[in-house]
Amino acid sequence: MGAASGQRGRWPLSPPLLMLSLLLLLLLPPSPAPALDPGLQPGNFSADEAGAQLFADSYNSSAEVVMFQSTAASWAHDTNITEENARLQEEAALINQEFAEVWGKKAKELYESIWQNFTDQKLRRIIGSVQTLGPANLPLTQRLQYNSLLSNMSRIYSTGKVCFPNKTATCWSLDPELTNILASSRNYAKVLFAWEGWHDAVGIPLRPLYQDFTALSNEAYRQDGFSDTGAYWRSWYESPSFEESLEHLYHQVEPLYLNLHAFVRRALHRRYGDKYINLRGPIPAHLLGDMWAQSWENIYDMVVPFPDKPNLDVTSTMVQKGWNATHMFRVAEEFFTSLGLSPMPPEFWAESMLEKPADGREVVCHASAWDFYNRKDFRIKQCTRVTMDQLSTVHHEMGHVQYYLQYKDLHVSLRRGANPGFHEAIGDVLALSVSTPAHLHKIGLLDRVANDIESDINYLLKMALEKIAFLPFGYLVDQWRWGVFSGRTPPSRYNYDWWYLRTKYQGICPPVARNETHFDAGAKFHIPSVTPYIRYFVSFVLQFQFHQALCKEAGHQGPLHQCDIYQSTKAGAKLQQVLQAGCSRPWQEVLKDLVGSDALDASALMEYFQPVSQWLQEQNQRNGEVLGWPEYQWRPPLPDNYPEGIDLETDEAKANRFVEEYDRTAKVLWNEYAEANWHYNTNITIEGSKILLQKNKEVSNHTLKYGTWAKTFDVSNFQNSTIKRIIKKVQNVDRAVLPPNELEEYNQILLDMETTYSVANVCYTNGTCLSLEPDLTNIMATSRKYEELLWVWKSWRDKVGRAILPFFPKYVDFSNKIAKLNGYSDAGDSWRSSYESDDLEQDLEKLYQELQPLYLNLHAYVRRSLHRHYGSEYINLDGPIPAHLLGNMWAQTWSNIYDLVAPFPSAPSIDATEAMIKQGWTPRRIFKEADNFFTSLGLLPVPPEFWNKSMLEKPTDGREVVCHASAWDFYNGKDFRIKQCTSVNMEELVIAHHEMGHIQYFMQYKDLPVTFREGANPGFHEAIGDVLALSVSTPKHLHSLNLLSSEGSGYEHDINFLMKMALDKIAFIPFSYLIDQWRWRVFDGSITKENYNQEWWSLRLKYQGLCPPVPRSQGDFDPGSKFHVPANVPYIRYFISFIIQFQFHEALCRAAGHTGPLYKCDIYQSKEAGKLLADAMKLGYSKQWPEAMKIITGQPNMSASAIMNYFKPLTEWLVTENRRHGETLGWPEYTWTPNTARAEGSLPESSRVNFLGMYLEPQQARVGQWVLLFLGVALLVATVGLAHRLYNIHNHHSLRRPHRGPQFGSEVELRHS
């Protein structure tokens, strides 16, 4: 809103604009007051009406000279703020005040007692004005102080800057930078920073000055007979009931404002959400598109009722058509001349400042119109921007100039509006026509005019955002100042009362805490510039009264809001009468001549907005909106990371375009990477590793590029949760954050570790070598020879763990650096973030503690069985179990020793392996059956690419491959594969269903953005296949596949089945829990590299109750013998998956209509169960995992109750059995280690056995045994006892080392780029 800073009324007694303009910046040290030219002093006049007329004429000619000089000095200063110009302005101000003093005192001396009786009304008004001295009443020292205060207040405001946090070189001025931010930015934090910065930078230093100004100003006007400055300002309206009239007007428009406020608040709530918008509270003051929330049209795009209708903001069209500031003023001038009014004089175009200078000058940018009082020089000062809003401001300012032109021949004291509101209303009246779609079409800014109710509502809402939104602000500013001047608002309550009024009338609140150190009123130009503000409230009512009358004069038919008086000379003639009167007559008379009434009335305004008023009421009633702000004390929280994150992008449309581009490019690149990775994993070669590293680099470059881009968005207030979630995920650039040389080194370390693991083998002394798959795995599963198992166990770790150890500390350093650069405390923190839970570690510990009693009972029972097989030399019934005796390289699952621990050995077998082999099952047949299970649930069959491209068996062509089972998504929506060195056995049948579960997950979410193509959390992906495997493993289902002769029944059969399942599921729980317990502590530094292995075995002892069968040292690295450690695959996912798969199973069984024990449930062919699974899988990662959990189970939490329910019969049997045998639960003799004197270091050949340290053929060994049998029994027993004792001592002091993740297929390594 442009204030007519140069417009003057009863000069020199109207402080608002001239006095301010006179005095602006930088006060210099006081100097002697310049003397008034004697020729400008008053002469001698008679003390009668005739003498008064001569007095007035003489005053007029002298005043024009003084006023021109003072206005010129102010103009020079405002358009070039320098110390010299400030000094010259000071001198002109003092001359001005001296002139006012001598002429005012003369008027009082001669006419104070008689002027009100003059017959000439104009003369009465002139003399009454001249004898009001204002600041000229003050003694010279106080006058200098008063001028200094005005100058300093103006300096503070005009030179105020807001500097970017921690970047002092980047500072924003109010115009254009801060104004543009408030108008166009939708970044909550950035707008807040601009708002807070401006209010602090300007308001705080103004506060003490304003207090002193108030005291001096009141003292000055009291000497003129007014109670305070506010009373003087109100006197211009010549109405004893002025304040009551204003209150009446406000109540007329209040219902419309309340409906507009509620509607806008709802729209802001859609944009900013509950965090920042309370639908029953005030609106944060910075969100309404304007520094002062006085007009809201800049947020029209957020609140437009019908977005599909033509855009009524023609800013872009103005820019496209090459409009500039001068053209905007020419267009405004042409409107006035089309009404028959005056064109701008040459001086206007020659001397005005229509744009912000580009030469670096400091200027006062606030738009203002200037009268130089020589009847020909009129100017506008405006830092014009090419926008529709500024086009209205241009018409507003030119309305002031037109007023100047029309009353320029009046006495200087009458050259002002009929009242101050008149002057503000004139330009706005024309702007009401200019802003109509019809007029915008006429001047080429709108292609067509839509005549329909929706377009009308759009237009009227846009106008309401400017006009109606302003009314409470226009009303309250001087309510506050009048309270300050009268003393009702003391300095101790300046800010409190300011915000009380802003909340009371506007329904807004400060967005940050404010107190009495602040002075937020001072952040508005008119406060430090001492420009009365109620004129704007009055003008916003008057302009609609004028508009209504002029439209009638122009012959307009139809709704008032569609009226355009352009080219109506009749309307122009009517308006000219108002302008030419100046303030020579009471404003009530002037108003009556134009509109037929002498009262301010809002009925014309209400008529104009009637359609949108009704529409707003209907919308608010439909939405159940609260009118007003009953929760008036509510305040919004500060944004996270404020103010550092203020420069982030918050435009959701831009974010959406980013997401679309990221998704499009990522699909292509991730497909290429997956192909290169597949090629390497299925044919390990140097050339393949080079290609993979190159693709890895390309993925990292892409990740870094788009991750860096994603970090420019502040998603905290995005209403589109999908966009928000994608960007937050993309912001984590993972390893791509490293510098290129370090990234290359890190990738090489990962490749070297995984390759070392994948190609490793162990060899007999005769050169025969064994790979992990299938050779070593088969030995660990089937051999019951202690020494052979020990040799395999130790040899694998010697070969793999020790080779990986040199890479690992550097890998840890890089992993932590990556995590920290991505905003995490360490790599463990980064891994845990995938679960989006602050309580993850506590929740996992709780789950583990719930399952521990069952594990302890299983451990004790298995230990007793192993003791029966291996004897007390190798098994201590009160100690840990040697880690190599449990049928698996890592002792993670124990099902391979089922034959040693079967509760009821005579019961029918529940292992389908023999039947599978007899029936000629192949790996392909295994996967076909798994595919059939999924399709029986109504789920998707695997596509042809799966069968054509998967590697389902270990190649026989000599290729080195990564045998570890894994499922692969190639990100093109049709190519999904499994890589598995499948053997034909029941375990592999279960594994196949696990891997196919991953494939099904891939297929279900294939149409989501690539960022969401993963499990709801990593444990979900692992659980899906295992859920089906729980059905596949049932005797009922195996019988249906003709793999068991019967479904089996009876207690013994059930306990055997549950035991076999427990050896897989329960035995695995502590192992899956401890691996990442170890890694998290490595990452956070609590486990140092010197203690890697010791702490590994401490955890394996603590949780699993296992010990190494041979001493371990710092040179060993047993965690590295587990695939997931060198492969950098987090492992806690498997612990979680083993919990939630039973929750899923229980829920799916319920959906399938199963009745009976949970462990007997088979969901095969249940479409109802399949639908639950599909609905959860289709979500991918698009929602937080509790939502997916709720779809399947009906509740959002992880729980061990389902798994405990599943194994309840076995738990009860184990407890009874262990009590019967007096088993110790746990391992109180935790320092015990097995006697391995004979076996340690043994290195068998393929056909030879170790006998007393010699490598003999089996026949020779047997002969040797008989020869030595009788001679050596006693010695042998003694030797064994001694060796046992010595090695107990030795092993007590040995170090321990870690290993990783299950080799069996329940741990797929997901290939996500």
From Swiss-Prot:
Chain ranges sitting on the Cytoplasmic side read 1283-1313
Q: What Enzyme Commission number(s) appear in the record?
A: 3.4.15.1
Task: Give the Peptidase M2 domain ranges.
Answer: 46-630, 649-1228
Question: Which biological processes are named by the entry's GO terms?
Answer: amyloid-beta metabolic process; angiogenesis involved in coronary vascular morphogenesis; angiotensin maturation; angiotensin-activated signaling pathway; animal organ regeneration; arachidonate secretion; bradykinin catabolic process; cell proliferation in bone marrow
Protein name per its UniProtKB record? Angiotensin-converting enzyme
The UniProt entry, under InterPro entries, shows: Peptidase_M2
Signal peptide interval: 1-35
